[in-house]
Amino acid sequence: MAIKTYKKGTEVQLSTNFKSTEFDCHGSGCCSNTLIDEKLVNYLQKIRNHFGKAVNINSGYRCKTHNTNIGGASKSNHMDGEAADIYINSIKPIEVAQYAESIGILGIGVYSWGIHIDTRTTKYFWYDGGASNVATFGNPSIKEEAPKIDTSKVENKVADPKVMWNYFKSKGLND
């Protein structure tokens, strides 16, 4: 798989349900190309096939200027065409995240409105924008009905006890 460059605004069919323009940077006049990781498109198509509903892309590629203007992370995977913020109408974000993890997606952020996925090679999950990134180990890691986690024992705090990482369990941090 590779990251490909497309001319912003030019529609190219990438898979059965996704077109290049869905990934275009939303910045105005700041860039002319769109970077898209083929692996990301494959993941999104698998998610679309599994749920049988449209996967809406809030944000795909972001050029550096637009990413800075919206307060994006300085090393955001969006700037490399390796990330998408998505939602599926009438599907809980946690359900989409659980499926994303089951198909091998390693970068997953869960928000009230949807999820962030990316093609990073290190396993990272986070919940809501206020939480710190937490490196995780084990599979699967995202649980909807997790026991209450005492986050006072860890440096990186989790925003919601509904999300549990096997790493915490292995360290005895879910008393």
Predicted segments, located by residue:
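Short, low-complexity, charged amphipathic interaction modules
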Residues: 150-175
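Extracytoplasmic cell-surface/polysaccharide-interacting catalytic and binding patches
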Residues: 1-50, 121, 139-142
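Solvent-exposed, polar/charged alpha-helical surfaces in well-ordered, non-transmembrane soluble domains
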Residues: 42-45, 49, 94, 98, ...
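Sec/Tat-exported extracytoplasmic proteins
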Residues: 48-51, 100, 104, 172
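Extended, low-complexity, intrinsically disordered C-terminal regulatory tails
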Residues: 41-71
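Soluble non-cytosolic domains of exported or imported proteins
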Residues: 34-41, 90-91, 159-162
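Catalytic cores and adjacent binding grooves of peptidoglycan-active enzymes
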Residues: 75-84, 88-157
